[in-house]
């Protein structure tokens, strides 16, 4: 194509460059028109939304109360200093088998004087830190009382299979995501628990209901072994409210101590207290016991994305 023909057709380098610029401006204008003011881009589809629930599977062990043949001495017992919240009966660290260890240095917490954080929420006495503005609790006297745990041998069967003493099976809990983003299992709203009048997950199973009034299976323990990823910016927490005994360990260290036979009591742990490393995976081990009539309450609330790490062997299938 000679220069004269290019000139006639308007096809020179300057015209070509102008056409490209105009096309780019047109595209940008169309994009601007299609995105309303204040609109934001869609989230990355490769990032999945948080799950609507998490399922945790652990082991429940059934016991017979102390007044019957082959009954366990720690179940349906009244502690020497009465029904109350007791601490200190167990070691600060899990044993080599991943289970809590009895040390027999328990004390009764004075009513109304729990250890609390600066917001007034109950925390484990072992995590008390005055530099954070925590409020110190009080012991009810100087005596030792382990909250109705007879000795190390009796406690040794709480979270271990013991032929003739307990029967065990797997048990799963579903924690549903709430509006604030935390995951909750609450026996006061769970349909099956409401129908049963409380947290009685093995009604008519294993040793069965013992009779009496109310005729519920009150005498059992439950353990969970889970993992999570620590997020230093996530304000991560774990809370339990219920009865009777509950102990929680993170990275093998006790962070909740709710020993004793008592009505519903609450403690929480804020994970930024624990010196964890951002992005690392840690264990959370949970141990619960229901030891006495007439109530059984159980509430877990957490914003941790927990998942089951392991399920110990059991003596019975769960249907």
Q: What do these predicted ranges mean?
A:
Residues 9-12, 25, 37:
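N-terminal regions of proteins, emphasizing targeting and processing segments when present
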Residues 23-34:
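Bacterial N-terminal signal peptides
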Residues 1-18:
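N-terminal secretory signal peptides that target proteins for export/translocation
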Residues 13-17, 23, 241:
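Hydrophobic alpha-helical segments and their boundary regions
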Residues 5, 16, 32-35, 40:
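Intrinsically disordered, low-complexity segments
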Residues 40-319:
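Acidic/polar, compositionally biased interaction segments
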């Amino acid at each position: 194509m000679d220069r004269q023909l290019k000139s006639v057709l308007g096809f020179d380098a300057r015209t070509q460059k102008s056409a490209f610029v105009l096309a780019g401006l047109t595209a940008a204008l169309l994009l601007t028109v299609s995105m309303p003011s204040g609109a934001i881009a869609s989230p990355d589809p490769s990032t999945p939304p948080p799950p609507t629930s998490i399922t945790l599977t652990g082991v429940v062990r059934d016991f017979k109360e102390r007044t019957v043949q082959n009954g366990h001495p720690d179940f349906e017992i009244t502690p020497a200093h009465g029904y109350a919240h007791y601490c200190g009966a167990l070691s600060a660290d899990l044993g080599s088998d991943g289970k809590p260890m009895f040390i027999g240095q328990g004390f009764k917490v004075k009513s109304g004087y729990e250890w609390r954080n600066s917001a007034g929420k109950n925390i484990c006495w072992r995590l008390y830190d005055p530099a954070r503005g925590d409020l110190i609790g009080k012991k009810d006297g100087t005596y030792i009382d382990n909250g109705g745990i007879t000795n190390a041998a009796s406690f040794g069967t709480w979270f271990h299979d013991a032929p003739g003493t307990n029967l065990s099976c797997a048990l799963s809990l579903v924690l549903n995501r709430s509006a604030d983003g935390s995951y909750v299992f609450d026996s006061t709203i769970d349909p099956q628990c409401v129908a049963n009048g409380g947290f009685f997950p093995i009604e008519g199973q294993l040793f069965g209901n013992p009779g009496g009034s109310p005729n519920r299976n009150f005498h059992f323990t439950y353990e969970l072994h889970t993992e999570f990823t620590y997020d230093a910016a996530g304000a991560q927490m774990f809370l339990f409210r219920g009865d009777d005994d509950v102990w929680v360990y993170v990275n093998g260290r006790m962070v909740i101590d709710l020993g004793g036979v008592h009505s519903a009591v609450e403690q929480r742990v804020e994970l930024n207290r624990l010196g964890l490393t951002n992005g690392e995976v840690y264990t959370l081990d949970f141990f619960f016991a229901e030891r006495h009539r007439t109530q059984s309450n159980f509430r877990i609330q957490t914003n941790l994305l927990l998942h089951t790490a392991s399920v110990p062997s059991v003596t019975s299938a769960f249907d």
